[in-house]
Every structure is written in C-alpha cells, then in structure tokens.
Curated annotation (Swiss-Prot):
Gene Ontology biological process terms in this record: axonogenesis; central nervous system neuron development; dendrite development; dendrite morphogenesis; establishment of cell polarity; microtubule bundle formation; microtubule cytoskeleton organization; negative regulation of axon extension
Composition bias, Low complexity: 839-848, 1548-1559, 1569-1580, 1593-1609, 1816-1829
Protein's UniProt name: Microtubule-associated protein 2
Organism expressing this protein natively: Rattus norvegicus
Polar residues bias spans: 354-364, 598-613, 780-792, 886-896, 1087-1096, 1514-1523, 1615-1625
Keyword Nuclease: no
Subunit structure: Interacts with KNDC1 (via KIND2); the interaction enhances MAP2 phosphorylation and localizes KNDC1 to dendrites. Interacts with DPYSL5.
Span list, region Disordered: 1-86, 109-231, 305-469, 575-688, 766-797, 826-866, 884-903, 929-987, 1006-1026, 1087-1170, 1207-1247, 1343-1384, 1406-1643, 1816-1835
Keywords from the UniProt entry: Calmodulin-binding, Cell projection, Cytoplasm, Cytoskeleton, Microtubule, Phosphoprotein, Repeat
Amino acid sequence: MADERKDEGKAPHWTSASLTEAAAHPHSPEMKDQGGSGEGLSRSANGFPYREEEEGAFGEHGSQGTYSDTKENGINGELTSADRETAEEVSARIVQVVTAEAVAVLKGEQEKEAQHKDQPAALPLAAEETVNLPPSPPPSPASEQTAALEEDLLTASKMEFPEQQKLPSSFAEPLDKEETEFKMQSKPGEDFEHAALVPQPDTSKTPQDKKDPQDMEGEKSPASPFAQTFGTNLEDIKQITEPSITVPSIGLSAEPLAPKDQKDWFIEMPVESKKDEWGLAAPISPGPLTPMREKDVLEDIPRWEGKQFDSPMPSPFHGGSFTLPLDTVKDERVTEGSQPFAPVFFQSDDKMSLQDTSGSATSKESSKDEEPQKDKADKVADVPVSEATTVLGDVHSPAVEGFVGENISGEEKGTTDQEKKETSTPSVQEPTLTETEPQTKLEETSKVSIEETVAKEEESLKLKDDKAGVIQTSTEQSFSKEDQKGQEQTIEALKQDSFPISLEQAVTDAAMATKTLEKVTSEPEAVSEKREIQGLFEEDIADKSKLEGAGSATVAEVEMPFYEDKSGMSKYFETSALKEDVTRSTGLGSDYYELSDSRGNAQESLDTVSPKNQQDEKELLAKASQPSPPAHEAGYSTLAQSYTSDHPSELPEEPSSPQERMFTIDPKVYGEKRDLHSKNKDDLTLSRSLGLGGRSAIEQRSMSINLPMSCLDSIALGFNFGRGHDLSPLASDILTNTSGSMDEGDDYLPPTTPAVEKIPCFPIESKEEEDKTEQAKVTGGQTTQVETSSESPFPAKEYYKNGTVMAPDLPEMLDLAGTRSRLASVSADAEVARRKSVPSEAVVAESSTGLPPVADDSQPVKPDSQLEDMGYCVFNKYTVPLPSPVQDSENLSGESGSFYEGTDDKVRRDLATDLSLIEVKLAAAGRVKDEFTAEKEASPPSSADKSGLSREFDQDRKANDKLDTVLEKSEEHVDSKEHAKESEEVGDKVELFGLGVTYEQTSAKELITTKETAPERAEKGLSSVPEVAEVETTTKADQGLDVAAKKDDQSPLDIKVSDFGQMASGMSVDAGKTIELKFEVDQQLTLSSEAPQETDSFMGIESSHVKDGAKVSETEVKEKVAKPDLVHQEAVDKEESYESSGEHESLTMESLKPDEGKKETSPETSLIQDEVALKLSVEIPCPPPVSEADSSIDEKAEVQMEFIQLPKEESTETPDIPAIPSDVTQPQPEAVVSEPAEVRGEEEEIEAEGEYDKLLFRSDTLQITDLLVPGSREEFVETCPGEHKGVVESVVTIEDDFITVVQTTTDEGELGSHSVRFAAPVQPEEERRPYPHDEELEVLMAAEAQAEPKDGSPDAPATPEKEEVPFSEYKTETYDDYKDETTIDDSIMDADSLWVDTQDDDRSILTEQLETIPKEERAEKEARRPSLEKHRKEKPFKTGRGRISTPERREVAKKEPSTVSRDEVRRKKAVYKKAELAKESEVQAHSPSRKLILKPAIKYTRPTHLSCVKRKTTATSGESAQAPSAFKQAKDKVTDGITKSPEKRSSLPRPSSILPPRRGVSGDREENSFSLNSSISSARRTTRSEPIRRAGKSGTSTPTTPGSTAITPGTPPSYSSRTPGTPGTPSYPRTPGTPKSGILVPSEKKVAIIRTPPKSPATPKQLRLINQPLPDLKNVKSKIGSTDNIKYQPKGGQVRILNKKMDFSKVQSRCGSKDNIKHSAGGGNVQIVTKKIDLSHVTSKCGSLKNIRHRPGGGRVKIESVKLDFKEKAQAKVGSLDNAHHVPGGGNVKIDSQKLNFREHAKARVDHGAEIITQSPSRSSVASPRRLSNVSSSGSINLLESPQLATLAEDVTAALAKQGL
C-alpha cells in the first residue's frame, strides 16, 4: 500500500531522522529496530514494519502509515522538518497552544469535542473491528492523522472562529503559530502541539525526558526487555491483534485508537524499547487526538526526546506515528492533562509525570493520579492488566500481564499491549475500557465510557446512528471519541492543568470517572453498562465541562478542533477517512457515508456516528456547559440540541439503519452545516491562514492523500472529501461542507464557529428548526418512507464513496451497493472528490438553503463559500481530476454520484416503484406546484408555502416516487426559480433522502426559507448578478452534476436497470442538489444581491475561474439580462441541447469519457462543448454550469416571469425530466433539472390537461429512464424501435467504471429511432422501455391533445428524452405540425434540420432566429426556442426525445406567450394532427432525408453524450444532425406554441446529409452558443414565440424565419448556416410544410411523422444550407467557442491553476514532496545500504566472498575435487576455472593427492567451484604450476593440463583472488 511504501520509505526517512535522533537517544537502536522501518515504530513496534503490521493487520494501517506519512509530508511531513527545526519552537508553540487549549478546555468546548470525537473514534473501533478492517486501515493513520489533524484543523478553525479565544495561542492568537502549528499539524508534532495541550507537550517532552532517564533506567530494562519481550510480544500480539488493533485503530478512526495502536506500536516498541525515547512519548503521545497530539507528540517527542526524534518522532508519528501520536498525544494529554493516565503510563514516571509541563498541578496530579493510577495500574494488573493495558492502551494483556509488575514500562507497555489487544481484541470495549483505564484512565476510560456512552447515547438516542452499526461504529468512533474524550478530559485536565485547581478537579473528576469507569471497565462485558458508565462518564465529562465552565464548551470546541483537525487531517489525509472507513467498514457505513455525506468530512466519520454521539454529547456537554460556551455557541448548541431534538426525533426513526442514522447525522450536519459552513469558512480561513491552502489545499491534500484511501475509503474520501471536500473546493466548500470537512461535530456542535457566523441565523435556525419540525412533521409521515430513502440515499450520496459503507447501503441499495463496492474502490477517490463537488454542493445547497433563511449575511458568506465552492468548483473539478485519472475521478465520482444519487433514486424507486402513483403524486404535486408556483411567482412567502406543500408533495412523491419525484423536483427545481425553489425542496428532499429525513426537514426548512428567498431570487434571476450567481452556482452544481452524473453514470453501470433508474433519479437528485446549490446559491445571491459585492467578491475570490466563466456567462446573462427570457431560454436551450445531447450520452459515455461527461455539461451550452473538453480534463463542469446556470437562472427567472402555467408544466415536465435525467442525468442533472423545471412547468400545464396521461407516459418514461439512466438512449432505442426511421442502435455496455456505448446507425426504421441497449444491466428495461415510451407517447399525445398548449412542450420534454422514438414520432408530428405552422420553416427545416443539426440545431436556430425573425416572432419563438433549443440540445442527444430542450423552449415560450402557446398548441395540435397527416405523406415524400435526419437526431443523442463528440457524431450520422435540427424545428414549433415540437423534431428526421453540417453546426453551435444565446435569447423569446406561432398560425412559410421550424426565430440573419444567406429561408422545400400544422393534427403517427423526411428538395437544400451555414457555424463556433473558451478559459484556466496547486499539494502531500522527502531520506539510506548489501551478496553469490570465507575453511581439497569434476566434466568452462584455482591452490602435492581423491569422490562436489575459486587466490602464487602438474597427474585435467590451463588457472586465480580478496 501507499502506506507500506510510505512506511518503508517513510520509515527509512523516519529512520534517518529516527536513527539520527535514535543515535542521539540511548534507545536509538530500539527506536531503529522498533521504529526502524519507522514511521515511528512502524515496523519495530510490531516487530515487523508497522506498515507491514498495518498491512498485515489491516492493510488499513498500511494506508494509515501512508496517510500518516502523507500527512507527515503534507501536514506532518513539514512538521517533521519543522519539528526537527523547531522542537523548542514546537514546545513553546505547544505551550502556547496548550495554554490556549487549556483556556479552551476551561471553556469545555474541547472536552465536548473530544468526547464527541472520542466517541466516533471509539465507535470506529468496534465498527472497524467488525467491518472492513482492510479498507479502514489506510485511513487509520491517515484517519488518525487526518481525523486528528482535521479535527485539529477543524478545531483550529473552530477554535479560531468561536474559540479563537479558546485557541488564541493555538489557533486564534497565533495564527502564525497556527500556521506553524498547522504546518506542524502538517507536521505531526505541531498538530500534536495543537492537539496536545501544553501538558501534552510537556508530558511528551518532560515525560520523555523523565521517561528517557526513567525509562532508560527503570523502564529501559523493562523497556528493553519489555520492549524486546513486549516488542516481540507486542509485535506478535500486535501482529496477532494488529488486525484487531488496526481495526480499533481504525475504529478510533485512527484518531486515538489507531494512534494508540500506531503510537503504541510506536510506543510499545519505542515506549518499551525506547521508553526513554518513546516510552513516555508513546504513552504520553497517545492522546485522544492524534492531530494535535501528534503535533505535541512530534513536538513533544522531539522535545522530550531531546529532539532526538525531533524529525523521526514526528516522522514515526507521521506514518505509523501520526497515528501513534494520537495515543501518544492522548497519553501525553492524559499524562499531562489527566495525570491519572500519565501515572498509569508513567507510574515510574512520577518524576516524568510531575515533570510534565503540567507544572505543579500536573505534578500534583501526577502524584495524585499517579498513585490512583498506580493503584489503578496495580488495579490494571488486578483488573486483567486492563489498566496497565490502558496505560499503553495498545499493549496486549499478555505483555501487560507479563510486565504489569513494570508498572511504568510494564503497565505502559502492558497497557499498550492490552490496549492494542483491547483495541484489536474483539473485546474491544472491555480491553478498550481496560485500555482506557490505565492509559487514559480518565481519557481512555472516558473513551470507553464515551465509547459506551456513545454507544449508549447512540443506543438511547439511536444517535441517529443505527445502533448496531453505530454501536460498532460507536465503539470505533467512541474509541476515537474516547481518545478525543480522553483528549477532552486531557484537555480538560490540561485546561485545568493550566488552571491547576480546575485541572486537579478535572483530574480528580477524571480519576473518579476513571476509577468509576475502570470499575465499570472491569466489567466491560456489559456494553450497556459501559454505555451507562459512558453516560456517567459523559456526565463526568459534562460535569467536567461544568467544572471547566466555559472551558467545557471550549474543550469540546478545542477538542472538536482536534476532531476537526482530524477532519482537517483527513482532509489532507484520510485519517478521518479511516474512521469513516472504520465506520463504513463497520457497517457503520452510514458513519462512513455520513462523513462522506457531510461532504465527506472526515470528522463526519468521527462525528457522523460521533456527530450524533458527539452532538448528543455536545448537547450534553452543551447543556452541562451551555452557560459556559459563548452565547452563540451555547445557543447554537442549544439549537443543535433543538435541532438534534428535532432531528433525533426523526433520527431515532432514521436510525433504523446505520446509513439512515448516518444520514440523519448528515441531515443534522447539513442542518448545522450552515453553521458549519460559516465555521468551515472560518476553518477555510484558518486553513488558509495555516497555509493549508484553505479548503482547496486541504481538499487537495485530502484528495491526493485521501484519494488513494478513497478506494478503501471512498467514503473516507467522502468524509475527508466531505471533510476534505469541505476543505478542498473552497472556503465556501468548507463552509458548505463543513459538516463533513470541518466536522460533523462542528455541524453537530455548530455552536462554535457557526454560531458566531450564524448568531443572526440562530433565530432563523430556530425558524429552520421550526420549519424543519414542520418539515419533520411533513416528513414525519414520510420519514418512514424517507427513512429508507434517507438511509439509503444518504449512503447513496455519502456512502457510495466506499464500498465499505456499501454493506449498510447494500441492503437498501442492493443494485447501488454492488456498484458502490465496485466503485468504492475504483471511484472512492474520485467519488470522494465527487463528494467534494457533489455532496459539498449538496451541503452547500442545503446549508445555503438554510442559510438564506438564517441570515442574509450568513448566506452571502455561505454563497461565498458556495461561490468558493463554485470557484473551487475548480477544485471540485480538480478533485475529480485530482487523481491523475480524471476518468477515475469522474467515473468513480460518477459512480459515487450515482450511488450518491442512485441510492436515493433507488430508494425512491423502491419506495415508489409504481410510477403511476408517482405520476399521480407528481400530477398532484405538479398541480400543487402550479398553485405554489403561481404563489411563488406572486409572492416568495407563498412560494415558501408552496415549498411546504410542494415539499409535502415532494416528500410524498419521494416516499412514493422518490426517484421520479426527485427527478421531477430536481428538474422542476432547475427549470424555474419557483420550480427551482420547489426543486430545491425536491432537491433538498432529494438530498434529504440522500441525507436523511432529518436533513430533509432541515433542508425543507432551509428550503422554506430559501424558497421564500428563491422566488425573489427567481425573480432576481433575470438580474445579472443573481444570474451570475446562478451561473456560478450552476457551474458548481453542474460540476457536481457532472461529477454526480459521472458518478451516476458510472456507478449504476454495475447497478442494474433499476440502478439506472435510480441513477437517473440520483442524477436528477444530484441535479436537484446541484440545482439546489444553484438555487441556494441563487438564493444566496438573492441574499447576495442584497450583498452582491460579497457574493461577487466571494465569487471572484473563490470562483475566479468560475467567475470568469461566470462572467462570461454573466456577460451572456447581462447581454441577455436585457432579454432575460432569452438568456434563460438560450441558456436553457443550451442546457437542453447539452443535456439532451451531452447528458444522455454522458450517461452512457460518462464513465468512459469523463471528458464527454464534461462535454455533456457543455453541450448543454454548445459554447461549453469545447469548454467541456477542458472541463473533462479539468472537470470544468463549472463553465457549462455557468451557461447552464445562466440558463437555469434565466430560465428560472423566465419561468417565474412566464411560469404561472409552468407549475402545470412542472408536473408534466417532471416525467420529461426523468427522461432527461435518464438521458442527461449525469452531466445534465442541472441542465436537466433546469430544463425539466421549465419543461416541468410546461408539463404541469399539460399535466392539468393531460397530466396523468402524460405522467403515465412520463412515468413510464421516467421509470424506464430511471431504470436506464445511461439508458436514456435506451429509451430512445426503445422509443424508436417502434418507429423505425434512422435507427441508432446504441449498445451500452456498462462495466464497472465505464459505460461503453456502441452506436450503430441503421436507416431501416420508419422513424429515426435511437435504440439503446445496455449490455447487461439495462437491457431488460430497454425492452421494457419502448412500451412505456410508446404508451407514454400515446398518453403524451393524448395529453398533448388535452393540453395542446403544453402538448409539444411537456410531451416533448417527457418524450424527447424518454421516448426518443415516440418523441421522434411525436416530435415529428410536433415538428411537422410546427412546420405546418411554419411552412417555410418546415421545408426549410428539413434543410434546416440538416443545417440545424449541423449547427447543433439549437444555436443555429438561435442565431437565425435572432436576426431573421421579427421581434414578435422572436419573442414567441425565443420563448419557445429556449425550450426548443433545450430540447434540441437534448434531442440531439436523444433525437426526438433528446430534444427535450424543445419543451424547455416551449416552456419558455409558454412562459412568455404561455397563453398563446397553449392556445396555439391546441390550435396547432389540431393543425398538428392535420399537419401530421399531411406530414406523413410529406415525411414519406421526404422519407429518405427525414429518416436520415431523424436518425442523426437519434444518433446525435448518443454522440452528444460526448458533448461535441455526440453532436459531431450526430452530425456524422446525419441523424444526429437531423435530430438537432429537428429539435430546433421542433423547438421552434414548440416555441411557436406547438407543444408538438418534440414530435415535430422527431417528425423531421433530418437527412443524413445534415451530418457533415451537423458536425460543423455542433462546433458552430458551440461557438454561437453565446452569440446565439445572446442574440437568440431575445430572438428566441420574441421571435420564437411569435414567428413560430405565426408560422403555426398562418401555416405559411415565414421567409423571415427560414429556419423557423426549429431555427425560425432568428435563423436566416443570425445564423447563416441555417439560412446560409437566404437560400434556406424561403426556399426550403419545407415551406409547403406550413399546411402540415393544419394537416399534422397532433395525431401520434410515430412512423409517419418521423418517417416523413423533409421534402426531398429540402434535404438537398438542407445539405446546401448546411454547407453554407458551416462557415456561419464557424462564426457561431467563434461566438460559442469564444464564449465557451471565455467561460472555460477563466474557469478552466483557474481550475487548472487550482488543479496545479492541488496537484502540488496533493502530490507533495501524497507522493512525495513530503512523503518522498521522508521516503527519500529513509529510502536513500536504505537503498545505499541495500547497494552495499547487494555488493556483498553479489560477492557472496558469485563466490568471491564465499570463496574468501571458504579459503580459510580449507576448501583446497574441495577445490581439487571440484577440479577433477570440472576437468572431467566441465574441462573447458569449469575446468579452466578449476585449473586456475587448482594451479594456485593445489600447489602442494598433498593438495593434489587430496584433489585427486576429491576429484574421484568429489564429482558431486562440483558445487564447490566457488570454494575452489576461493582457494585459488590463496594458492595461486604457490601451487599453480604444481597444480597444473597435479592436474595432469590427476589425469582428469589432462585436457586442462596444457599451459593454457595454467595460464587460465593463474588468470582465473588472479581474478578470483581479486574478487575474493
């Protein structure tokens, strides 16, 4: 493992430092031997390399070592250097930090945090023990480091924010020092400095000094013997128990336990072997919190080791030792703060304990506690060496029993041994208690108690964690928490140590509690009793917190920072990921997931189980010390308690499964995540101040370090990428994902920083809590349903990351589970990265959602953080690319996203498999949403009401049809701000389902507030800033969606058809989340509009690249702001085109082509297509999301403007949305959500009339789509199979990480049909989909007939994506109808179809529409064109169905001229049916070209998956080109108000000749995307609605709208390629198509319509037009390309820069800057030694050495005998050598005679050739002549007897002599 490598390299490196310092140190050999491999005791501790032990034990400690090494390098690696440099500085800094922390401990915040953290740590112990020990191990050191460091980091952040006074010296006061400390955190020592209180450094330093003398004296004998004995025992025991220990270590999330194990591995060997060196350090060092402790330990170890291990100590702590410092620091802290532990650890260390920097208080307590703990140590001996075991905590009971007599070393070692034993032993709780008793009697007993209390608490509270998984996780996490609690107590003790009275009291209390706990620990069998004792201990801790007063909150907070720093470390290193892995592995997968869900906060792993426990404990502590915490802290703790109370009520419901509990925690985290967002923002600031690079750097490190773990810990990555993710993307990401990154503990104990930031938010939070309570009530009924959803979706979102967590997820998401496990390892890194982007965004959305209600000020900050997320969308993008395989990231992320969303979807699917019910609910919800949408439009408050009702409906939908509902809602959400708000609700609920009911409530509350803001925002959406914000947010969200889409696309690959449905749903959910992010960001921007500068500055700061792209989008938006509808429509068109083309194919191809996935995002905006390519590499979903966000914003604004009807459309569109998610689900979720929101509004309009029919159709489509997220094409295939025109057969082979789409284009079909086959998983649904598609097509047709105005739009939205062929048919009808409306457009459209397809159909139409179409027409057409364009883009992806963009455009058209559109749609539907009839003949007349056109359209659906590739593929296939032009035509017609535009799109299969122009068009379309978007957005709205209406109404060809079929609005002037002059405008043979509107009644003649090709002249003209427009397309490409490039370059460039930064940070942290440095040192030395050894070995092998050795051995006889053999047998080869040897060696006659004898006898001795050679040098001078004679006399050497033989013999002898000598 990397850990092994790092351990090896690190160990050598560490050994170099270690040996250097060990050489200085008396115990250096022991250190070398024990820590020789070293990351501090890496190998020596176990008797075999710690890495091996890790590996052997877990493979997790290998990762731990790796991560600790990474941490060492990334965070601790510097610390190693800094520690070496500034051990004294570290000591001073530690003193400062300890002072600050002591103050913080007095505040009690640290204790809370430590308790909570200890709980998670302890929980992971059992959980890790129980579950996936190997996956956990990599995080164990890293988790420890990461969790501890992250915890420390988070603590630092928290302490910095709320507790800056708490951590004034540690974090707040010495930010420089913090930076140094964070460097030291980066360097374990500094982290420990941070982590360990002042006493800890002193304890580490002084106890080591004492222990160096004492251990050298008293314990060296015990230590050396004990180290040897115990080293052997410990190594053996560790080897034996290492797996268990590693599990406990992992169970501790490597925070305390893994540190203990590691430390105790370090400590045991070092503590025992070099107890002087490490002895005290290890026992002292094993503080609960590795990060700070590691700092302290590293600092302390350098200090107490006389800086012998200055570098090595940190180094050992780094690799194995970073985990070790957890225990070491814990022990340090315990020794210092809770002197009972110090005495237990150092009972012989009374001097050392007294000498601890604790000073008199510590000395007193050392004596005091030493005696009790010596008594306890004796008790420990009595108590099956439990306390002695606890002393070392990791020492095994055998060794402990053996060495219990050696209370100091024996007890320490025994404690370490037993601690390890306990940690590793299944009786982890008992041994943990035992461990806890001596080692941290207060601390570890606290841990055990906390462990038990946590388990108890979790059990009692269910702690939102499943008891079973949580209890295991509680044991594991409680172990970590115990470590942390021990740290808390230690911190309390240290705080009290700083305040001797308080310390004594705390220590006394700790001793009392420890004794009590020890007593209980003596009875560890009773886990409930343990939990009771834990509760007592928690009470003790609470009492301590009370004793500490404010210090309790401070301790909790400070320790929370430890924990947070652990999270921070996990951000850098998957330390927390270890816990998360432990949690996840434990089947606490929920914890794992939860951590992942909290944006992968590593602390969420600790605090996921822990956050619940931690928050509960925090609540207890907060309740106990609420007076003491700052008002905001206490208030927020109270809020958290209230929130927790609200949620625990839910969460107890949720705890049904660990995932659910985790989810509940995550909802809590998300609920408090807003607070944590602020906190994380501060944390980010802290991280940045600390030089962590802020969230980005942390994320980078986390990515680089955590990504490797991510395979094991995709959730750990999720956690650390939740956490790391929080840190990584942005400060806002941190803020947004603070719950994950900064801490779920922070989330759960937001009272720290979030309270400060959210002090104004508290009332709102209460509001939110009330809303959440209401939501909980609303959700309450659904909670059971949602519970499964939230349980599964939460893991789906959060736990997907790790296959580990898949175990809990598996039951709920069986399909996703399988995929997840696959993806867990494969996409763990990317998935964590994805979690960073997607869950973070989800968190951002949720937090922001809550925040806008909470406080506008907070919201701007959160938008800031979210904008930073957007800005760090780069990092999110980079996070995906961060692992060099962008595809891995994206694929893994995609799969994770799929799990992340797919699980939700799956749960929703499972909950609401009946799409009919979903449809009904969707119809009801859509109608309610219509009402609410109108309300939203009317007033934000009614929007909030609507949100509530819509939320209820959404929840019902979710409960019943979580997949479809989420899809609908996400899409609704994206499409209109009102819908966006609704979708926010939906997305929140989607997220809630992903996160859990608790978060659903929180999100719902947030959404209520957010939606109140959202209507404003939606209204503001038209304004440039909100749009920009939306753009940026959308960029973020789109990025996340891209990520999630890729996740979805990749994860469900293995999943199944249902998984695909879930994937579609999940993508939709992710889109919903992303859209939530969009809308929340929009809402935040609404708030930010209030504080636009802040938003802009934050955008500019954090999302400079995004802002550049966003500014491009903003420029577009501002361009379009004048024509906001156009902007929205244009963006929507882009989105739809992108979604239809890019997303659909992205589903299939995203895994294969993350680039394509990116492109999918960008095809949405053709501009972004090129950008998408960059996005692919840089994962710049941001730029397309910017366009998408612009589209979404504009669309949303437009929807709000035009969307009183939209609500109807919403519901109807929702089915379409599911279709879109299927097609577009992965990169399109935003786009899909955005488009579907509009489409949905339109659909809701239709839904009023044909809602149920369409819903049935859509539900089927949705079901199919959901089943086949990648199978959107499959939908197309299925849809198209009935209608055989151009048949694009896509065989989607879904492999683990890749979706391979093989597209075959056949011209056989009547209608262009895109048949998508999913090789294994999805094919059944493929087959099944055609039916729903056809049924739904008919239903949609009926619905179209019913709701003609919406018919094309809703139907098109639903069908274009879902039923590609049905909509191809239907669109053909709609399109033909549209053509009938616009006769010229129809005839032109055939040509235009080619042209439009070439031009990506959306943009060419947009461009032409802009100039050619009158403003009236433009207004109408634009209104339609956005939808049309969207559908075009979608339909290019999905052929007719893929033209869902048409529904959006139609929706836009309907929004603006919705009334007219409806009437027209109805009128045109009548005409449409007539035109359909006419068009059937026409289509038959145009049959060849139309088939080709439709075929390209369908094929375009596939190729568009690669945004450009897909479009170009479409262009190539001609069908794709036709499909886009059909889309455009259909869009234009839909824009004209013909809701049949989907059919028309489909009905106008473009000639294959479109293909070349299509490709050109796709490029031009990309280029023109901006221009088209800008110009066409106005033209779109104006021209689109009216010109198409005119065309539809008049049925006459509109010369002004030559391309008005789809391009009608602005086709000729703006888009030359469409109207390559004027030829296409009037002369399109489709001009006769005008009658089609009348003729093509909206009868769904799928075959006839699609079959009817553009009039044969139109096809040539189309080809000609295509050829002509291609230059225009180039121009368009210039526009689009410039825009895309602009968007992309800023974003891409920034992203790239950020990627570079992240790469450097990660590469350095991971690979080698620091790791390699350490490794180089160690590796270089080892290599050099190896070389020497190799030389020796080579010589030995060759025989020179052997011969040299053999020479004295008297090998003369052997040589002679060999000579005989050689002469006889190998005369030439061997004989020559033999002769040479023999001549010199056999000079003596005696030798000759012997030789002769030997020759006779020694033919078997030919082996002695080497010996012979050896002798030859010795004899060479004397007997070579005689030997020749002898040889001759031998007779066997006769041949060799020649002088040549003598010469050879002499030469060989000389050579051999040289060699031998």
